[in-house]
């Protein structure tokens, strides 16, 4: 295997080899590439931006927190400990703490990422963010590490400086219902030029069969500064926190479920399940019923407060029990499951889907549901939008399949634009650039086949890259963080 060469970084990368399509794609992309980034859903840590401290090292920035990287390396037999992932039990063998060793292990296995979106994103990061032109491999690992480490010590590579450099107009974090929002208040007064907003995610409070639910409820009661003894107390406290999140700039809620079942029960039945949870005797079926009821309740509250409701369905989290018990969640062990939406969402959509005050954005890991169920529903109900390709599908071919399978049925403007959904801060511009290239290529093919003209393609390209996300998340009604 050749080592030490210059990274191939063609200007027409990811475009179709057909010269007609490529020409159109390049022209469309040239009009979208420099648009500001709107990141309406993601997992960047607000505390990192508030503190604005230098990143520690290349390994802790790029490798250890990225579950896309962890899953593929683990699949090749690379121990997670060797990548800096600490076991939950102190008695277990310790994780590697030398960032150079972690980076070398990553570089030794860089070949595993060929033709994956992770390779595309990190190639972009190395070249465009850090200015590194040599190919990453075993032989160049130290050189690349040293170059990144040197840059990370400069003021230009602190989080807020990168935020400006990345041209991020809006960045939404995802926050627990008990979050103090202190970091967001700090950022709101920092005059960053970027609007940084929280997202309300109450999932842990809805999982009443979880052994940690009691502790979550206590933390939530502390955050709301009120006793929560009944189901009505609970719902009122949720509404209070939603209002506090909205006052801090939130535009959306987020709800992760395996099955998107929606069914309203009586308040008396909901109270019985809540009391069972407080006694620690709620079953998995109790939790399923409680979650399905609370999705209905969250939709009702969204009608009233205007927060956009996001539902992420079809991911069986922590599929690998051994990895979950040893290392905890978000280690790359989430797996798609076949997911039914037509019947499961019908109660919610019949109750609220015709109300233009309500907005529901649905994401799935079940690709087969795009054309079979979600695009037809998004193409009918005024309140519903189809979310961007997610997790396994925000890839070159995955995003192209999404466009081909949904546009003819839902129409472009019933989709919610792109979101990067990432914890990997430095990958944000890479992910948006890849999406803009894929969308330009999709549109270029439509122009080449005379389905649309170049004027339509330019307008659609801008919608896909920028306008749809702002519209979907109701981001057009306020200025940037720090504006008076």
Task: Go through each PLM region and give its residues.
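Active-site-proximal binding-pocket segments
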Residues: 318-388
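C-terminal amphipathic alpha-helical interaction region
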Residues: 309-311
């Amino acid at each position: 295997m050749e080592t030490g060469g210059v990274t191939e970084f063609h200007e027409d990368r990811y475009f179709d080899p057909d010269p007609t399509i490529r020409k159109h794609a390049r022209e469309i992309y040239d009009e979208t590439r420099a648009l500001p980034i709107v990141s309406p859903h993601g997992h960047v840590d607000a505390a990192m931006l508030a503190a604005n401290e230098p990143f520690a090292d290349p390994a802790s920035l790029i490798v250890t927190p990225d579950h896309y990287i962890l899953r593929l390396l683990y699949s090749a037999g690379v121990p997670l400990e060797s990548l800096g992932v600490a076991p939950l039990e102190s008695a277990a063998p310790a994780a590697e703490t030398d960032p150079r060793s972690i980076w070398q292990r990553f570089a030794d296995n860089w070949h595993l990422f060929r033709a994956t979106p992770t390779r595309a994103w990190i190639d972009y990061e190395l070249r465009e963010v850090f200015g590194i032109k040599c190919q990453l491999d075993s032989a160049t690992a130290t050189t690349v590490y040293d170059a990144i480490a040197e840059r990370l010590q400069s003021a230009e590579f602190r989080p807020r400086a990168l935020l400006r450099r990345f041209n991020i107009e809006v960045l939404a974090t995802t926050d627990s219902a008990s979050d103090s929002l202190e970091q967001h208040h700090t950022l709101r007064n920092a005059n960053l030029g970027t609007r940084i907003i929280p997202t309300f995610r109450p999932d842990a409070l809805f999982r009443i069969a979880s052994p940690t639910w009691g502790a979550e409820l206590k933390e939530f009661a502390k955050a709301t500064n009120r006793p929560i003894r009944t189901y009505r107390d609970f719902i009122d406290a949720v509404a209070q926190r939603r209002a506090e999140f909205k006052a801090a700039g939130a535009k959306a809620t987020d709800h992760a479920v395996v099955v998107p079942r929606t069914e309203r029960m009586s308040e008396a039945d909901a109270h019985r399940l809540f009391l069972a949870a407080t006694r620690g005797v709620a079953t998995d079926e109790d939790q399923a019923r409680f979650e399905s009821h609370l999705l209905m309740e969250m939709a009702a509250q969204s009608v009233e407060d205007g927060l956009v409701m996001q539902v992420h369905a079809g991911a069986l989290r922590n599929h690998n029990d051994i990895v979950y018990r040893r290392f905890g969640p978000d280690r790359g062990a989430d797996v798609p499951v076949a997911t039914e939406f037509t019947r499961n969402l019908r109660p919610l959509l019949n109750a609220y889907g015709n109300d233009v005050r309500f907005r529901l954005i649905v994401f799935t890991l079940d690709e087969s549901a795009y054309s079979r169920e979600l695009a037809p529903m998004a193409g009918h109900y005024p309140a519903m939008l189809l979310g961007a390709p997610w997790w396994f599908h925000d890839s070159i071919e995955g995003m192209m399949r999404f466009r081909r399978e949904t546009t003819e049925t839902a129409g472009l403007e019933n989709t919610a634009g792109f979101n990067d959904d990432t914890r990997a801060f430095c990958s944000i511009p890479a992910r948006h650039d890849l999406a803009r290239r894929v969308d330009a290529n999709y549109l270029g093919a439509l122009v080449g086949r005379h389905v649309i003209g170049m004027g339509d393609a330019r307008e659609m390209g801008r919608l896909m890259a920028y306008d749809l996300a702002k519209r979907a998340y109701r981001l057009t009604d306020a200025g940037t963080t720090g504006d008076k």
